[in-house]
Amino acid sequence: MHYMFTNSSLRSRPTLYALCFSMLLFVFTLAGYNFDNYGSCFTVSATSIVVSLACACIAFCCALFLFQKAEKNEGIAIHSSYICFSLKSLFLSSAIILLAWMPYYLACFPGLYVYDAITQVYYSLGIGVINSFHPLVHTYWLTGFLSLGNLVFGSYTAGFAIYTFSQMLVMSICFAYVLCNLSQLCRRRSVYFTGLIMVCLFPVFPILAVSATKDSAFSALFSVFVVQLAKLCRHEECFLGSKKEVSVLFISALLSGLFRNNAMILIVLLLLMLIVVYRSKRQFIVMALIPCLILLLLLGSVVPKKISQITSNSSEILGLPIQQIARTMLLQSDSISQDEKDAVVSMIPNWGLYNQRIVDPIKFSGGTSQAIADDLPSFLRLWAKLGFEYPRDYIDAFVAQTEGYWYIFSNYDTVGTTKPYLEFDQWEVMESGTLGRDMGQAGYDVYNVQDIENWIIPFRHSLLPSLLPVIRKLCYDPFWMNSLFLRLVTSPALVVWSAFLLAIVSVHFRKMDLMIPAVTIIAYTMTCLLGPCYLIRYAFPLYCCAPIILSLLLGLFDCSESLSS
């Protein structure tokens, strides 16, 4: 390692980039460590500094080694030809994944009816209201199979079983496609097997595969979109000359945007970015991607707003500002002026319900969501004014709600106390007008409803009942959260920092097109920072893209000659 620290090396641009990367990691690690241990990121100790410096030093050495290894191999090597995989490999990989997931499906049969599924079904089938608060494409995929099961078999449970299996099938094909394409990003077969083991055996994958949530299918489709972007960067001429590759990019971009409301704008911006980066082939890109943009805007925004009786509003992306104002009111009420207090109360009446990990108790009570949407400019002015006066409280509020995405040692037992790691128990009718469900360490959730007969709940009938307690424990008390090493290895933040490192390396070698996959992952993470809380299902796309980022980083070690042979 001595060659890393020669005088010429210390004066080089790679050293500067590596230093900037490591210092940024130092700042975020220090903030996360301080907040978790002392309640504020501004309460610093010798221990927190030592831990953060150690992480920064390791990051600096890794980054510098990566720069120098890539330079030795003549920069970022670009494959000159495809390393095609066969349909047999795709089907075999998909079958292996499905087989590995099957015990979860049989144990949880007909699937995990959790998260927002019960609400989506209530509006669609229970009272016949079009509600685009959740993506319509997922709502009608779910309710369509429920209706089919009820029509053919006289059972919503049968329909839900078909839906769950269809979701598993779609996800297994998507992941198999991603894994089979890793050979086009680097020449190490070990990456394929590592990714396959991760998808098959890491419990987050099979559990979310049998869970009725839009995040499951979105994550799989998003990983296909990202791997297509990576292939475009590595094989520009071949990729753009292949109708099949462009079609997969088109379809994955369209479906990814339709399966998550906050991802639609991200996908639109990325497609526009492609047009700018590949301006020499602007006409072809425009001809291929403009229809995708139009369809995405029509199906994801215009049509839902026109046909929906209930839609989301601007407050959906203002969870963090709401939390920052509420935290400031809670901690600085004695020094805030009466006019400012009145302004806060008029928009956030129940700010006293502040929970530093989730905004929902405030946002969905007292008419907060609608009040902010009705007078957004006033809310933003109030937010900015209090932010200038109390920046520390704003920063602490940011750390409290988002650290799971960027703090590599984040423990879900600390950051996720309002929601379980993964949901397992579904809603049950407790008594007339009341629905309830167990949420593990997060407590018991109760929901009072007026029309209990309109709430549809499939019956859970486990075909492997002995496995149910094991899966339940994996959802509520995952063993990898109890080990510092396993927590680090399975941290979504590790994927984000790896993507950031790839972006920096791309800047150094002036390969701006290679930045696109890394920027895509970073940009998705930034959309999550605006969400209501940190949840594993929101971070699931980061897990799905981990093999892609690993392949791109390992590809820096491949020699140009070997890649073109």
Tell me what each language-model feature is.
Residues 108-120, 129-145, 149, 153-158, ...:
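Extracytoplasmic catalytic/substrate-binding loops of multi-pass membrane glycan-assembly enzymes
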Residues 162-186, 224:
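Transmembrane-helix motifs of polytopic, lipid-linked glycan transferases
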Residues 245-260, 271-272, 291-296:
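Membrane-interface alpha helices of multi-pass inner-membrane proteins
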Residues 309-462:
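Membrane-proximal stem/loop segments at transmembrane-domain junctions that anchor or position
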Residues 1-24, 41-101, 556-564:
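Start-transfer (signal-anchor) and selected internal transmembrane alpha helices
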Residues 115, 207-218, 259:
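Short acidic/glycine- and proline-prone juxtamembrane loop motifs at membrane-interface regions
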Residues 125, 177, 217-237, 253, ...:
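Specific aromatic-rich, kink-prone transmembrane helix
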Residues 18, 88-92, 178-201, 219-220, ...:
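Transmembrane-helix signature of polytopic, membrane-embedded enzymes
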